[in-house]
């Protein structure tokens, strides 16, 4: 193990990275709160500013993937599709099998200039997660309780509000509704069999309401649906903790573009289209498991320096006063002050670990274990 690889495994460095992310996030959230005064004056200016503020926070996580762990991402698609990236509004459909699938999506958003304006249909619980949920609130992210009777009006209103968004946005949908686990897959396939739908090997049964509603509400705004099927070489199952420890992964993403006009207007037909899409995604995963790669041309978009420069800027601003403060605490010789500081460090470490826990599969929601048995 080289010196750099050794340093990446050290708890103290993890604490410093976490400190920069949390404190910069709180600063960004405060500035976002102040920008609310702009909404009545210029809604579009408010949106543009918040896209850049969100970028300053999200890009720190992307930096960990691209520069800290040096994880590589390869696209399997065609040249015509690549040329449209970042130049149109799009709905993204991504499989939800991995703890860092969102991070791989974000790194592609960053490389094509839409990270700050990226959107997602997110579960309501995430709204209350510090930094993440707060930042999303100011970005007009659409939240749902995953109970369609209660969500319908909220989701429709949130989607329609995005129809005049001033920056190109990629709107992410996890159509499976929850992250893949063996238990959820078994329950999901029982439902598929009961409904006469083809059994999926690598995905859960897609929940169609969110997709058909998004397509309906964003028609005229969104130009296409990008179907993204993600997997990792070497049968790896990466985690955010692994990224933090500097582990390098190799992500492969098969991207297919479907013009929105090719998706049926009728809700039932659109739902059937989505089910067919997931059968195709399942077939793509089977090909990957057999051949170790997806079909199509390979593209490796170059990582950009902005994520690293953004993090280094925040680190320079925040760590200098932190080091001065720590030196002052220990120089004081006060046992009470030192113990108080160490207690704060422990609490901060616990808080950062809880944030990471949001991404972990074993700590994910139980949604899907029984929900598939209910009528969608």
Curated annotation (Swiss-Prot):
<keyword id="KW-0808">Transferase</keyword>
<feature type="transmembrane region" description="Helical">
    <location>
        <begin position="317"/>
        <end position="339"/>
    </location>
</feature>
<dbReference type="GO" id="GO:0005783">
    <property type="term" value="C:endoplasmic reticulum"/>
</dbReference>
<keyword id="KW-0472">Membrane</keyword>
<keyword id="KW-0443">Lipid metabolism</keyword>
<feature type="transmembrane region" description="Helical">
    <location>
        <begin position="125"/>
        <end position="145"/>
    </location>
</feature>
<keyword id="KW-0256">Endoplasmic reticulum</keyword>
<dbReference type="Pfam" id="PF01553">
    <property type="entry name" value="Acyltransferase"/>
</dbReference>
<dbReference type="GO" id="GO:0005789">
    <property type="term" value="C:endoplasmic reticulum membrane"/>
</dbReference>
<dbReference type="InterPro" id="IPR002123">
    <property type="entry name" value="Plipid/glycerol_acylTrfase"/>
</dbReference>
<comment type="pathway">
    <text>Phospholipid metabolism; CDP-diacylglycerol biosynthesis; CDP-diacylglycerol from sn-glycerol 3-phosphate: step 2/3.</text>
</comment>
<dbReference type="GO" id="GO:0008654">
    <property type="term" value="P:phospholipid biosynthetic process"/>
</dbReference>
<dbReference type="Pfam" id="PF16076">
    <property type="entry name" value="Acyltransf_C"/>
</dbReference>
<dbReference type="GO" id="GO:0016020">
    <property type="term" value="C:membrane"/>
</dbReference>
<keyword id="KW-1208">Phospholipid metabolism</keyword>
<dbReference type="GO" id="GO:0012505">
    <property type="term" value="C:endomembrane system"/>
</dbReference>
<keyword id="KW-0012">Acyltransferase</keyword>
<dbReference type="GO" id="GO:0005635">
    <property type="term" value="C:nuclear envelope"/>
</dbReference>
<keyword id="KW-1133">Transmembrane helix</keyword>
<keyword id="KW-0812">Transmembrane</keyword>
<feature type="topological domain" description="Cytoplasmic">
    <location>
        <begin position="1"/>
        <end position="124"/>
    </location>
</feature>
<dbReference type="GO" id="GO:0016024">
    <property type="term" value="P:CDP-diacylglycerol biosynthetic process"/>
</dbReference>
<feature type="topological domain" description="Cytoplasmic">
    <location>
        <begin position="340"/>
        <end position="376"/>
    </location>
</feature>
<feature type="short sequence motif" description="HXXXXD motif">
    <location>
        <begin position="96"/>
        <end position="101"/>
    </location>
</feature>
<protein>
    <recommendedName>
        <fullName>1-acyl-sn-glycerol-3-phosphate acyltransferase gamma</fullName>
        <ecNumber>2.3.1.51</ecNumber>
    </recommendedName>
</protein>
<feature type="topological domain" description="Lumenal">
    <location>
        <begin position="146"/>
        <end position="316"/>
    </location>
</feature>
<dbReference type="GO" id="GO:0003841">
    <property type="term" value="F:1-acylglycerol-3-phosphate O-acyltransferase activity"/>
</dbReference>
<keyword id="KW-0594">Phospholipid biosynthesis</keyword>
<comment type="function">
    <text>Converts 1-acyl-sn-glycerol-3-phosphate (lysophosphatidic acid or LPA) into 1,2-diacyl-sn-glycerol-3-phosphate (phosphatidic acid or PA) by incorporating an acyl moiety at the sn-2 position of the glycerol backbone. Acts on LPA containing saturated or unsaturated fatty acids C16:0-C20:4 at the sn-1 position using C18:1, C20:4 or C18:2-CoA as the acyl donor. Also acts on lysophosphatidylcholine, lysophosphatidylinositol and lysophosphatidylserine using C18:1 or C20:4-CoA. Has a preference for arachidonoyl-CoA as a donor.</text>
</comment>
<keyword id="KW-0444">Lipid biosynthesis</keyword>
<dbReference type="GO" id="GO:0006654">
    <property type="term" value="P:phosphatidic acid biosynthetic process"/>
</dbReference>
<keyword id="KW-0539">Nucleus</keyword>
<comment type="similarity">
    <text>Belongs to the 1-acyl-sn-glycerol-3-phosphate acyltransferase family.</text>
</comment>
<dbReference type="InterPro" id="IPR032098">
    <property type="entry name" value="Acyltransf_C"/>
</dbReference>
<dbReference type="GO" id="GO:0000139">
    <property type="term" value="C:Golgi membrane"/>
</dbReference>
<dbReference type="GO" id="GO:0005886">
    <property type="term" value="C:plasma membrane"/>
</dbReference>
